[in-house]
Amino acid sequence: MKKIYKEQYRQIGLKIAYYRKLRGLTQEELAEQVGVTPAFIGHLEAPNISKALSLDTLFDIATVLEVPPHKFLCFEDP
């Protein structure tokens, strides 16, 4: 049975937005440094969209934002 992790992806996106803003980066700047499109970052951060991403991309984002990857994977109950 395949489980859909919509809420977890939403929380990851909100954390990406939080740490990106904390570092003073725009979505465009983060996208350029990670090697993805600004639209991809926008979709990740949108609270009403559950966009999946690979661990490689998550690790790249964590590296650019200087945040340990596990910070993105600690979830609150919905």
What do these predicted ranges mean?
Residues 66-78:
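Short C-terminal boundary/hinge segments that cap the last helix of small helical domains
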Residues 48-63:
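Short, basic-rich loop-to-helix N-cap that marks the start of a DNA-contacting helix
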Residues 16, 27, 38, 55-58:
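Helix-turn-helix DNA-binding elements, focusing on the entry/boundary residues of the two helices
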Residues 14-33:
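Short basic helix-loop element that most often maps to the first helix and adjoining turn
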